[in-house]
């Protein structure tokens, strides 16, 4: 369950930002999850609640936004949207793709009190 370590990293980022800006309470967090990140929403929600306990983010609302993955096709030299790791290029059907975005979990926004 790598969702737990991803959420721990996210909460560390949130804590650092809260300390830098003298924030006492985080009320909402938006996480951006890439289509190829291999994380399950239910596991993220469960893990996030656990790692937020005792932090400025405890009890905050968690919003999850999904982001499609983008890859560079070496065969047709185009940036394309993909939805799985073993995808083919939707333009030329080539299989030589380099994933550029969409394989991460990012703290996109934090709402504070």
UniProtKB/Swiss-Prot annotation:
GO biological process, any: protein modification process
Residues given in the record as Ni(2+) binding sites: 2-3
Binding-site residues, Zn(2+): 73, 76, 89, 92
Alphabetized UniProt keyword annotations: Metal-binding, Nickel, Zinc
GO molecular function annotation: nickel cation binding; zinc ion binding
Family: Belongs to the HypA/HybF family. HybF subfamily.
Biological role: Involved in the maturation of [NiFe] hydrogenases. Required for nickel insertion into the metal center of the hydrogenase.
HAMAP family: HybF_subfam (MF_02099), HypA_HybF (MF_00213)
NCBIfam families for the chain: hypA, PRK03681.1, PRK12380.1
Protein name: Hydrogenase maturation factor HybF
